[in-house]
Amino acid sequence: MMGREHDKQAQFTPDHLGTKPVAYKRNKGKKMHNKSNEQPDVIQTKGE
């Protein structure tokens, strides 16, 4: 769970990524969610 939250925060703060594009990270997260076959917790966290 904590790992997912970290991913979300990293997306919000592209400062940490710097050389890495945010789109790349987003794509990775999307793939992960698809593999897990579970609802994206990121969206729920964002709403809250």
From Swiss-Prot:
Bias-annotated ranges (Basic residues): 23-34
Keyword list, A-Z: Sporulation
Superkingdom assignment: Bacteria
InterPro entries reported in the protein's UniProt record: SASP_SspN
Pfam families for the chain: SspN
Gene Ontology terms: biological process: asexual sporulation; sporulation resulting in formation of a cellular spore
Stretch list, region Disordered: 1-48
Induction annotation: Expressed only in the forespore compartment of sporulating cells.
Subcellular location: Spore core
Single GO cellular component term: endospore-forming forespore
Disulphide-bonded residues: none
Family, similarity comment: Belongs to the SspN family.
Protein name, per record: Small, acid-soluble spore protein N
Protein species of origin: Bacillus pumilus (strain SAFR-032)
Classification of source organism: Bacteria, Bacillati, Bacillota, Bacilli, Bacillales
Gene expressing this chain: sspN
